[in-house]
A protein has these predicted regions:
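Juxta-kinase regulatory segment immediately upstream of eukaryotic protein kinase catalytic domains
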Residues: 1-29
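Protein kinase glycine-rich loop
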Residues: 30-36
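ATP-binding glycine-rich loop module of kinase domains
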Residues: 37-79
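Conserved short submotifs of the Hanks-type protein kinase catalytic core
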Residues: 100-113
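AlphaC helix of the protein kinase catalytic domain
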Residues: 114-127
Length: 134
């Protein structure tokens, strides 16, 4: 595991990945680097407001697949976001192809990420393979 910095925020990765593109979105105020989806999340702020950037392509620490797999999954998710357009779901505001990944832009919503908590994921990874599969 290595730590790279996005602005002043540490981002834990399996190996180095260029994240300098995020500067173009604004000032980073939050980083989500512990997700099991293969994505990184960034809370950014600029003169237009606050936004959530979902990025696939970096070697995230809790994802067992490749960056290419994560990019493909996010491409498929973009299609779902477009079909799922509903007032209760944060709107997909934009999609940007990056040299090494894919970034999706959403409005920032106060809260916390849904899904498995990192401590549960860590505890499961400590189990033997037999116990994990049972």
């Amino acid at each position: 595991m290595i730590t790279v910095f996005v602005q002043e925020h540490p981002v834990r990765l399996k190996s180095w990945h260029d994240l300098s593109f995020i500067d173009g979105f604004g000032r980073v105020f939050q980083v989500f680097d512990h997700l099991i989806s293969g994505n990184l999340g960034f809370g950014v702020e600029n003169d237009k407001g606050r936004f959530f950037i979902k990025y696939a392509g970096a070697p995230t620490i809790n994802y067992l697949g490749s960056g290419e797999d994560a990019i493909e999954r996010l491409h498929r998710a973009v299609q779902t976001y477009q079909v799922l357009a509903h007032p209760a779901v944060p709107a997909l505001l934009g999609v940007e192809e990056m040299p090494q990944g894919l970034a999706c832009v959403f409005p920032w919503v106060e809260g916390y990420p849904l899904g498995p908590l990192p401590e549960h994921f860590f505890a499961m990874r400590q189990l033997s393979m037999v116990d994990r599969l049972s």
